[in-house]
């Protein structure tokens, strides 16, 4: 016995919300929806809603709006090893989170810890601090800052034209090209944790 709750409305809201937003920006929302590659990132507990109900609803409206091509399914998000529970007050409210941290911190952390499978994921505040401070800020942010600062101080903010490549340059280009291909493969396979 499955319960429908508000799933009929929810599926239609994906479409109507997207279309309303795009049309408020002067774009043809229906065309945008139907021309896009559609992903529905869902939790493992609502698989049947997306694979059965969503499909049936779209077919019932004569396929006027295309179905998602991909439905990556993830595990549950835990907080400090326990299941989120709004009724017990064991959750992180998005508004409260965003008062303390930039949205990019949440995007980075969740992408970094979420594998492309249905195993549960644990949001741990200590791990969040380590990954944000040591990876995002100290490694990625510092690298970008140093590269841009160097370019600004040595070349007035303009990357100079190269004169010729030596063997070391060619080796670096080969390594960067291979790394780019690996990252693209991970991203195309929704393995954002590995891409990072």
Residue ranges and their predicted role:
Residues 1-153, 189, 194-195:
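Structured secondary-structure scaffolds
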Residues 126, 158-184:
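Acidic, turn-prone loop/beta-hairpin segments
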